[in-house]
Amino acid sequence: MARASSSSSPPSPRLLLLLLVAVAATLLPEAAALGNFTAESRGARWRSRRARRRAFENGLGRTPQMGWNSWNHFYCGINEQIIRETADALVNTGLAKLGYQYVNIDDCWAEYSRDSQGNFVPNRQTFPSGIKALADYVHAKGLKLGIYSDAGSQTCSNKMPGSLDHEEQDVKTFASWGVDYLKYDNCNDAGRSVMERYTRMSNAMKTYGKNIFFSLCEWGKENPATWAGRMGNSWRTTGDIADNWGSMTSRADENDQWAAYAGPGGWNDPDMLEVGNGGMSEAEYRSHFSIWALAKAPLLIGCDVRSMSQQTKNILSNSEVIAVNQDSLGVQGKKVQSDNGLEVWAGPLSNNRKAVVLWNRQSYQATITAHWSNIGLAGSVAVTARDLWAHSSFAAQGQISASVAPHDCKMYVLTPN
């Protein structure tokens, strides 16, 4: 770089003014972020800042992923017939048309050992036709096939190999089979760091798996929300969910703290849905689905959709709630108000709208009020409030209140008039 001459004259007032204007122009966007702008403009600036942080971009996950995963209901008891019948059921029940597109095989799909060339071998008893044939079947239904591996020597079941030190080989295999999604778990790590192991697979995916959605399942142990956007399309922020109220609510709370890191192309993941597995009440499942939708969490069904009840189907197929999850603005809703288990969760949507959930985590009926000041609306703003579970609309101004049953919720979209 050339040095300035020591004999050069001081800058002119005009030059100083131009420099000040240039500096102000660079600072203005960040200063403006403190202003009271619309949800769209805030979201656009936020997405721009996030895009500059991201190095992983495969064009996938512009909205949170939707589909089905085998683990919560079947654990290791899976086979190719279940996967085929699940794909059929997603189509026949209308769930596929609502956006549930991924049919994801979890752990236990492969033989215990690799073949002589070091390749995965699909389990000969449970997947005798192989994964390629299964992918072809699922694709013919207009759906996508997902598969599972692990950033370790074995998967979490200890019944099949992991992908550690086989990353490129395995991604090439998955791509050759037509796999569309990879869930990548975190067991049997051989004492090697999370960053090393997930970076290796991310690099392999960038080179050989560009059309494969990459879901990191690190369990939130090392704050993946702060770094996984450089590596994949979603990242677990919590440990495994269980089919009970305490587990579901704690996962919601743990995930909430990382809201600023989610957005189009990369999402926080508080784990799969338990709706329909029988461990919670209808009200609790409705709350579960509503909070996951508001928080822009992946909507991955975890029950047996071949035999689900009408009650379960009604929850999973609420198109108005799904629309909140899939909104193009892509901003994760958050807990904005809490009073002894009576909570308000809210977030911005496209077209200046707001999504609001009134959530009663107490064991008694209670009235919950969301004040405009807590959800980013001026007090004078009048809205049309759409109740997403009652499928009815009404006018509101300044606040919205409802009597909410124990462990239940009310969910609204507010559209300024």
From Swiss-Prot:
Its EC number is 3.2.1.22. It catalyses: Hydrolysis of terminal, non-reducing alpha-D-galactose residues in alpha-D-galactosides, including galactose oligosaccharides, galactomannans and galactolipids; melibiose + H2O = D-galactose + D-glucose; raffinose + H2O = sucrose + D-galactose; stachyose + H2O = raffinose + D-galactose. Alpha-D-galactose binds at W71, D106, D107, C156, K183, D185, W219, R236, D240. This is Alpha-galactosidase. Disulfide bonds join C76-C108, C156-C187. GO terms for biological process: galactomannan catabolic process. The active site is at D185, D240. It comes from Oryza sativa subsp. japonica (Rice). Optimum temperature is 45 degrees Celsius with p-nitrophenyl-alpha-D-galactopyranoside as substrate. GO terms for molecular function: alpha-galactosidase activity; raffinose alpha-galactosidase activity. Optimum pH is 5.0. Slowly inactivated above pH 8.0 and below pH 3.
